[in-house]
Design a protein with these regions (language model features):
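Membrane-embedded alpha-helical segments of multi-pass membrane proteins
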Residues: 2-16, 36, 93-97, 131-139, ...
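TM-lumen/periplasm interface segments of multi-pass membrane proteins
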Residues: 17-19, 23-95, 328-349
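Alpha-helical transmembrane segments and terminal signal-anchor/GPI-anchor hydrophobic tails
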Residues: 47, 52-56, 67-70, 74, ...
Length: 349
């Protein structure tokens, strides 16, 4: 826990710096935090989800066939494995790629980059260890510049580039059409419809039988479902958290016709709709992996909200609530019994 506590407290302290008013110090901290993130992900050992599967795959990827992994991820492993047997070299290379795509996007578009990094760490902790999807997630975050610049060819080329690492990226293809504002009544109507579908259990009643056909590896699905089934309260808190930030962000959209705030709002709102429909159904764990591409934009929404509502008192309250909620999600979400893949954080040396 010491590593997580240090990271959270350090990033929280950095988030108080006014980046725009102290650009020189801000750039230094931003660069330092980049290397801190790389070392945090690259030097871990037996820490994070799916550690054993990915570690064994790396050791044997030059001669064993692993059909369950996408070709891009296989090739990436083979390239590094051909040079060294040290798995941490692979993790460091992956971390450089992932954060090398995410950090420039935050620096370019976030209203408060250091605050966004604090939110990012709290949000992505449960994704630590999901090597394949983390690469495709990083590519998707980098690709939002093409949405904002209306360069649809480059956006969909980015999607194609991410597919060899994790096919779930295909769900993000809809993002290009979400950079426009809807009338309030349409947001409300969509949410009411999704709540209705959830209350009347429409998904399981009419589509539950196809779960085995879309889940692929049933053994892994059952394992993840067991994890999900322990978190009913966490699911409710997830819906409440999403609703809270959307409610706080909506007044800031009055002058927004396009831009990152509007795009982030719509992507995050879509994650709320999907989460509401599939929460508690047999599809929950399958869909939750896909919604990571939308949920991640919470980090930008929180930054806009905290930045938009001036006042130190407001900032303290908002960040405290955010920290407590994300700490609960990040540390306890994957606990099954006494086992937790994140605790303790272990270094490779």
């Amino acid at each position: 826990m010491a590593v997580y506590i240090f990271m959270v407290l350090f990033l929280y302290s950095c988030s108080w710096l006014d980046f725009k008013a102290n650009r020189k110090i801000g750039y230094i901290l931003f660069t330092f935090i980049f290397f801190l993130f790389v070392l945090h992900d690259g030097l871990r050992w037996e820490t994070g989800t799916d550690w054993g599967n990915y570690y064994r795959f790396f050791l044997n990827c030059l001669w064993d066939e692993w059909e369950q992994f996408e070709p891009g991820y296989v090739l990436f492993n083979q390239l590094i494995r051909g040079l060294t047997i040290d798995y941490n070299v692979f993790l460091l290379c992956e971390a450089v790629i992932v954060w090398g795509l995410i950090f420039p996007t935050i620096r370019k578009y976030s209203p408060d980059p250091l605050l966004t990094l604090f939110c990012l760490y709290c949000t992505l902790l449960p994704v630590l260890g999901m090597n394949r999807q983390l690469i495709s997630l990083a590519i998707s975050i980098y690709s939002i510049r093409f949405i904002l610049n209306r360069q649809w060819i480059f956006f969909y080329l980015s999607i194609l580039l991410a597919c060899p690492f994790h096919l779930s990226i295909l769900i993000f293809a809809v993002a290009y059409f979400l950079n426009s504002k809807l009338k309030t009544k349409y947001y409300v109507l969509l949410l009411v419809v999704c709540i209705g579908l959830s209350v009347f259990d429409v998904i399981d009643k009419y589509f539950g039988e196809i779960v085995p056909y879309v889940s692929g590896d049933d053994t892994r699905l059952m394992g993840y479902t067991e994890i999900e089934s322990t978190g009913v309260n966490a699911s409710f808190l997830g819906i409440a958290r999403k609703s809270l930030w959307l409610f706080l962000a909506y007044p800031l959209l009055k002058k927004e016709r396009e831009g990152l705030l509007l795009l982030s709002f719509n992507l995050y709102f879509l994650s709320l709709l999907i989460y509401t429909i599939f929460n508690g159904t047999d599809f929950q764990i399958i869909v939750s992996r896909g919604t990571n591409y939308f949920t991640i934009y919470e980090v930008f929404i929180v930054s806009y909200v905290v930045y938009g509502y001036k006042g130190k008192g407001v900032k303290i309250i908002m960040l405290f609530v955010y920290f407590i909620g994300m700490l609960y999600k990040g540390i306890d979400y994957y606990s099954v019994g006494r086992y937790n893949p994140f605790i303790p954080y272990q270094f490779c040396f």
